[in-house]
Amino acid sequence: MKIYRVLVHLSFVLGMFTKTNTVLAWSKYDLVHGFMRVANISSIMRLDCLPNLLSSNAGYAALPSDDIPTGIFIKVNCSIPEFILWYEQKAMAAWINPIMGTVLMMNDVLKSGLENSVKVGLLTFLKRIAEKGPNGPLRNRGSGCINLIAPADISCYGSTRLDRFNRDFEDDSRGMPCRAKAMRRTTSGSRRANA
């Protein structure tokens, strides 16, 4: 009976991969959608949900830090659940890919030493979250840009614009890490700041 339950859970996890069609082709590092400065847990939970269009069309990138998060939060009241990593010492939160977040948490539950009844309950909860998630693939945005050592560094997008991850087209197309602002000439000959 125990082996049967494990096989059922494994088939569900594998079903998550086939449901999204492209998860198996993703890099395991492509997790982060965006960062935001937050003072505490209640600040995270009081934020409005991301708009559906932004959530379902979001790009995801690698975590720019090896820091271990202080907490993991799942906002299930949103139409597309939001997985949030909170870094207490840096007062930062990262919104991660909900498909990958669900799959990775399921994997951790399966590998844990928890009692079977607890595992079944957690996996049922995660399955419900997965069913609310986007059905299509989520695109990879490339490397993120945030200076976690100096989050007040205004040269990094995501730390100066706290408007829930709006990025310029140039930020995504270059795929470059944080860079200092520098003046550059436009085609009209005027100068403008380059973030």
From Swiss-Prot:
One of its GO terms (cellular component) is host cell plasma membrane. Keywords: Disulfide bond, Fusion of virus membrane with host cell membrane, Fusion of virus membrane with host membrane, Glycoprotein, Host cell membrane, Host Golgi apparatus, Host membrane, Membrane, Signal, Viral envelope protein, Viral penetration into host cytoplasm, Virion, Virus entry into host cell. Transmembrane segments: none annotated. Residues 28-195 form the gL alphaherpesvirus-type domain. Disulfide bonds join 49-78, 156-178. GO terms for biological process: fusion of virus membrane with host plasma membrane; symbiont entry into host cell. Pfam families: GlyL_C, Herpes_UL1. Residues 28-157 are annotated as: Interaction with gH. It is a peripheral membrane protein. Residues 1-25 form the signal peptide. It comes from the Viruses. The keyword Nuclease does not apply. Interacts with glycoprotein H (gH); this interaction is necessary for the correct processing and cell surface expression of gH. The heterodimer gH/gL seems to interact with gB trimers during fusion. The heterodimer glycoprotein H-glycoprotein L is required for the fusion of viral and plasma membranes leading to virus entry into the host cell. Acts as a functional inhibitor of gH and maintains gH in an inhibited form. Upon binding to host integrins, gL dissociates from gH leading to activation of the viral fusion glycoproteins gB and gH. This is Envelope glycoprotein L. It comes from Gallid herpesvirus 2 (strain Chicken/Md5/ATCC VR-987). The lineage of its organism: Viruses, Duplodnaviria, Heunggongvirae, Peploviricota, Herviviricetes. The gene is gL.
